[in-house]
């Protein structure tokens, strides 16, 4: 049978999602916990592989098993064997045609900036500290130029292995909440470092180092070296993955922290 999981994790202590030799990953911990509960080797497939330091409140995975357990037993059992920084939020049996990656129709990320002169001593791993006043309204205005179907070559990592840089962005919003600025973005799929590179570009605009029209130039030139720096990973969260309603997956609050779904 095929089972889907909703997973939340603090990425600060892991070398990314993907299992790797000699370093600790989220995938490794999850597969080891599942193997113990299922009493058979388990390998998982995720909706989106996150980099080292990147978090998730809405990661989705699936796996195959012959073990028969109620959903609640899976949830409680798996969490027993996971570290405190990883939590399974829901479990659901799914049809064989469900695929965590290929069935997904959209991914949604949120990037949290702590815009204050002094860094935070409490949320250091969960937000990115950027000092110097940021004009979030300029950032939002510039971000709207990214909505729609574009070639995002200027915002992909140099080592990105995607066959095409064309992606369709359904929305991107920039909103200030006191000392915090949140960038909320959704697209059908994302390139490697795409959200972090967009964030670095918007920060330069927010600092008024570049004009709003710079985004138009970057979309036209399709050159990663011309865009902003890659923002740090610690402010980035995968908060939701969208699937067809026919799969009827559970819907939980996206977060992270204090953020409402419709913030």
Curated annotation (Swiss-Prot):
Biological process, per Gene Ontology: tRNA pseudouridine synthesis
InterPro entries cross-referenced by the UniProt entry: PsdUridine_synth_cat_dom_sf, PsdUridine_synth_TruA, PsdUridine_synth_TruA_a/b_dom, PsdUridine_synth_TruA_C, TruA/RsuA/RluB/E/F_N
EC number: 5.4.99.12
Gene Ontology molecular-function annotations: RNA binding; tRNA pseudouridine(38-40) synthase activity
Catalytic activity of the protein: uridine(38/39/40) in tRNA = pseudouridine(38/39/40) in tRNA
Entry keyword set: Isomerase, tRNA processing
UniProt feature coiled coil, ranges: none
CDD domains (alphabetical): PseudoU_synth_EcTruA (cd02570)
Primary role: Formation of pseudouridine at positions 38, 39 and 40 in the anticodon stem and loop of transfer RNAs.
PANTHER family found in the cross-reference section: PSEUDOURIDYLATE SYNTHASE, TRNA PSEUDOURIDINE SYNTHASE-LIKE 1
Subunit organization: Homodimer.
Protein name: tRNA pseudouridine synthase A
Organism lineage string: Bacteria, Pseudomonadati, Pseudomonadota, Gammaproteobacteria, Alteromonadales
Designated gene of the protein: truA
């Amino acid at each position: 049978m095929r089972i889907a999981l909703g997973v939340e994790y603090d990425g600060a202590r892991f070398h990314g999602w993907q299992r790797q030799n000699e370093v600790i990953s989220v995938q490794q911990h999850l597969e080891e916990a599942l193997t113990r509960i299922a009493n058979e080797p388990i390998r998982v497939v995720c909706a989106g592989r996150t980099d080292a330091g990147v978090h998730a409140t809405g990661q989705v995975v699936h796996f195959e098993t012959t073990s028969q357990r109620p959903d609640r037993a899976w949830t409680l059992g798996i969490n027993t064997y996971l570290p405190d920084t990883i939590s399974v939020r829901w479990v659901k049996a799914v049809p064989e045609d469900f695929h965590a990656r290929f069935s997904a129709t959209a991914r949604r990320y949120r990037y949290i900036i702590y815009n204050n002169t002094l860094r935070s001593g409490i949320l250091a791993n969960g937000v990115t500290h950027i000092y110097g006043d940021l004009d979030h309204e300029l950032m939002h205005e510039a971000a709207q130029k990214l909505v729609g179907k574009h070639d995002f070559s200027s915002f992909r990592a140099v080592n990105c292995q995607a066959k095409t840089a064309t992606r369709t962005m359904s929305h991107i919003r920039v909103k200030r909440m006191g000392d915090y600025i949140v960038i909320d973005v959704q697209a059908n799929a994302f390139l490697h470092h795409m959200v972090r590179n967009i964030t670095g570009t918007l920060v330069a605009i927010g600092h008024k180092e570049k004009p709003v029209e710079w985004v138009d130039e970057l979309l036209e030139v399709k050159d990663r070296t011309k865009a902003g720096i890659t923002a740090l990973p610690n402010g980035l969260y995968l908060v939701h993955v969208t699937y067809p309603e026919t799969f009827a997956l559970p819907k939980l609050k996206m977060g992270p922290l204090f953020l409402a779904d419709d913030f």
